[in-house]
């Protein structure tokens, strides 16, 4: 009878412990690939009351779907909405998020234009209760969930105090920033994956 060989570098007790450790790894620790959804939790800037969430999901060949829910707005008010270059909402007025996310040659404008900033998302309007919802699809030629210069991950979504006029440079005359949230990728089982810095 042939006796099975035993790996001299791994005693039975040690090997069994390692096997249990691998099996016990939580699903939330698994980082998913570039197609995974991302989200942002928006918090009010100093003196403001607006807050909410924004989700970023693949819309297949159409690009990326953005869904936004806000509260704490003035009833009937209209607000500019943009993705900003830096994933940093630490400043009291959110100026740490930098300018609108854009690639070389783009100018501020409306979603219907061909050469608007990648981060131009138009306006949202609050209802009688001060809440607002928006759902829009952004083509992959503007922004994407995948890694690279067009990635939305690691940037910030910002709500402004005034409407975006969709033409004034560089930001549509949309006023102060009243809410800001960093866009993070999610992980399997919930939670947040370590943020991969966006690259321009």
Placement of each model-derived feature along the sequence:
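N-terminal leader/targeting pre-sequences
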Residues: 2-3, 21, 25-200
